[in-house]
Amino acid sequence: MEAVVNSDVFLTSNAGLKSSYTNQTLSLVDEDHIHTSDKSLSCSVCNSLSQIVDDDFISAGARNQRTKPKRAGNNQSQQPIKKDCMVSIDEVASTHDWSTRLRNDGNAIAKYLTTNKYDTSQFTIQDMLNIMNKLNIVRTNRNELFQLLTHVKSTLNNASVSVKCTHPLVLIHSRASPRIGDQLKELDKIYSPSNHHILLSTTRFQSMHFTDMSSSQDLSFIYRKPETNYYIHPILMALFGIKLPALENAYVHGDTYSLIQQLYEFRKVKSYNYMLLVNRLTEDNPIVITGVSDLISTEIQRANMHTMIRKAIMNIIMGIFYCNDDDAVDPHLMKIIHTGCSQVMTDEEQILASILSIVGFRPTLVSVARPINGISYDMKLQAAPYIVVNPMKMITTSDSPISINSKDIYSMAFDGNSGRVVFAPPNIGYGRCSGVTHIDPLGTNVMGSAVHSPVIVNGAMMFYVERRQNKNMFGGECYTGFRSLIDDTPIDVSPEIMLNGIMYRLKSAVCYKLGDQFFDCGSSDIFLKGHYTILFTENGPWMYDLSVFNPGARNARLMRALKNQYKKLSMDSDDGFYEWLNGDGSVFAASKQQMLMNHVANFDDDLLTMEEAMSMISRHCCILIYAQDYDQYISARHITELF
């Protein structure tokens, strides 16, 4: 296929305003079973509810919250609704002040489309810009196009947020079955109002005063208790050990359970749930959970997992990195089936995709070529939760490595074999791979055409690097015991990316653990032994390494902690370290060793230099997370409202 060189390809790409969401694989509600907090061998939802009942988030007495009386719906709302109808959510949703004007602009554009009978199946960004000029809508921030397009997509019916009635949240709001009310009444008994309110308030209060793990450096980090075997997964640490724009709004400020309550009871959807609501209503594909056969049960399990992850976030900020068997969220995440991806995922991609899908988080909008009828292609805007990088399908040399930087970031393609957006710079031969539809949308002068960037990002941009070999021949390590071979092809990872005039910094990275190469230079192991996370905090790169099960790793960790302590005493000098260790530092070394034997560490123990961190990330990274500074992300929205 001949490559298309078109500097305006982003503006002329199909925006996909018509929702392709369909949920025909599951029934509406289980007519024969109501989920309770009783443990059951045959119902995974009941088991997860029983764990929520056992949780105690309160260390002191608290007055129970009184639930507000429900507004009775009319008789028509109790009748089944046709699948093709649209339902208005505008009257039940409120917004933050900074999003009100953006929402009104989206409503005006949607009204113009319906009044003039536009063909929304061929709608492009250029069409939206033309309409904005006619309506005198001025949006100077290019990244606002991401959310403005989302609002237009979800407001095409009577200028109000709307989706097809097959969406489970809309079915809950319209009370499509009396059994939905019976199930939610049981949930009200299970979710203690006081406990759940305390959990929400605690995590939101923590968020106000949290930047990254350096904010908790006055605490001792506890990695394990004698009676526990589970721990906070490194991917959870990468996502929530540092405050990420947009994801923080959806996961910490938003809450799936209270959103379901507000929709069913015809109450105003609170402003903190609004972005969660919009993310969910505009998702492209539903998720299916193994062992759950109906839509309402899927939403309940989704709310349960959101609550479990919220508790994990609370523990992360408090320096508690272990968890009981009942609190482990990893097994639940592995049971999610992603209907939009047509191939088996690795464990890391499965966990990352599952965490993001619970709140419908898709922060990247990319212009890609989508095949049509197998003989041609059409340019379409594709929302993606993360971008896939596959070194094993790329032809690289020492002069032309895989580079993730401000220049190559504009090269994306669509992999028709898996249904994912992939990172495909034209100089590495990815375009010749089967299933990948590749074009060069910006021509030869990439930086000169940055104003027509085919990528816009809402706060954060994530990359998943496929390094596992033979991943389609075996299942995950946690179920088969097979150890994958890891491709350690070095990647030139830039600490900063300039995208659309906004600086995105590398905030965190998840890496494969193949041994302790940094401390044992003779190690040549290529087998996967686990994962670790590197967070780029205000005090420098910090490593989250679960080394409590390996004596060699514990010794390496002790040496790192001792060197960090000596550098603080000697003004970052390494000279005389071993003399200090045998002399004045012997008492500190003994106390630090005792702490690590008890699985307790301090923040300063695991600090790295920037050179060490980038060297480890280059060869072993599997997840990279770039993001704006959170304060700049929020303040930009408030400043926009002033104009």
Curated annotation (Swiss-Prot):
Keywords: Virion
Pfam family, one: Pox_P4B
UniProt PTM: The 73-kDa precursor is cleaved to a mature protein of 60 kDa during virion maturation. Proteolytic cleavage of major core proteins OPG129, OPG136, and OPG098, which occurs at a late stage of core formation, is required for production of infectious mature virions (MV).
Localization of this protein: Virion
GO annotation, cellular component aspect: virion component
Propeptide segments, given as residue ranges: 1-61
Superkingdom assignment: Viruses
Family to which the UniProt record says this protein belongs: Belongs to the orthopoxvirus OPG129 family.
Function, as annotated: Major component of the virion core that undergoes proteolytic processing during the immature virion (IV) to mature virion (MV) transition. Essential for the formation of a structurally normal core.
Protein name: Major core protein OPG129
Gene designation: OPG129
